[in-house]
Amino acid sequence: MARDSPSSADVSSGDFVLPYVPLIPYNATNPTGGDSLTQDLNVYYTSGDIAWLLTSTALVLLMIPGVGLFYSGLARRNLTFSHTAGPFIGNLENIGLKDVLARPSVGSARVPDLLFAVYQCMFAAITVAIALGALSERGRLLPSLIFAFIWSTVVYDPIACWTWNPSGWVYQLGGLDFAGGTPVHIASGSAALAYSYVLGKRAGYGTQKLNYRPHNVTHIVLGTVFLWVGWFGFNAGSALSANLRAVMAAVVTNLAACMGGITWCLIDFRLERKWSTVGFCSGVIAGLVAITPGSGYVPAWAAVVFGVCAGVACNFATKLKYWLNADDALDIFAVHAVGGCVGNLLTGVFAADYIAHLDGYTQIPGGWLNGNWVQIGYQAADSATGMAYSFAVTCIILILLSFVGRFIPALRLRVDRAEEEQGIDDVEIGEFAYDFVELVREVRPVGFADDGESEIGVGGEDRSHSRATMVRGSKEASGESYPLQAMGRTGAMG
């Protein structure tokens, strides 16, 4: 049985020969990432910083199902961080995690490359998850997975590189984006708008048939909770260290979320005289999006302004899709792209040098609070470039995939009209969040059957719920059938 270290008895008896040599201190300039057999790779780093970033990684991972729950409820029924890089994208020095082990990361010398890579992988994943909300009710799954890989490589990676890599043009210009206002939110929101254009409008768009109504408020609340909790890892974790700057990022994140939710809810109440749970949750997400770029730069009181401005701007931006003539079913562009732009611009106003220096080493000229009037221009340039690049390249990717789909039916971006009417869950997955067949079996009277047959159709094939009919018991012998009708409030069928 193998043992990690010799026991005291073995050493005292003199019968044990040490199977190892004392490890030498790790040389952080080693280009290979270190050798754990000859070097102590742990002494270079603080265990608290590593523990915090590991926790933040898990929190950001939690955001991915949070996005799924949030948008499913709303629906109707890092390769860029190279140590040597250009101003637009990194290189392939560390492809396949080559030599990524204990060398200090380009993001911070306080955490190793390997941990930083995993953390940034979560950022790329959540960004793609947000953008793919544009598939709602009409997009195919397989081509979207191919799109996700291509998009994260040629859209997310370059934007993340020019924003955060010390060699990136926005970084060199002086743009401030602490946790992803442009790479994550503006990029994903713009991509969702492009995806909506290329896919086209849903069947029945503009008619009462598509009158918007969230089908599951519980999912929306659960998704919001997941996202809210995960955002602490998203923003505070971007400090890449357990320090006061991370604490301040957590504080402003929570304040902006609260104020965004309250503001959106108040706007909806003014129009509808209802305290909307969906409105509050949407406002929370808007506030979280807006505070993302400024979370490590702005004081606590400024977070209130971020939340209020985001709640107002994103609420009214939900009407932009009609002006843009786009079927953005889940308002991803309004909340993420517009919210990201609001956050970027407000960061240029409220960024404070003393907040950034809470980590002990970051120095910035600040924003308007420090008299740096040009900062908002840098922020606007970053926002506009990120939006234009993401939208244009996303359109190119989708047009190419659509062209390929003409020859390979499985890669068609959109389901056909009949499949759309049948439902994406049925056509693409064959599984359902809610089994209406079971509901029918529970509520129908004894003697009713589907299509005049037993619950298992001819040849043992299950009857599809989409074609279910009911036979009145009194006419069962004749086999006369009637379409399945909805149950009224009194319990009667009609």
Region annotations inferred by a language model:
Residues A2-G494:
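Glycine- and aromatic-enriched membrane alpha-helices
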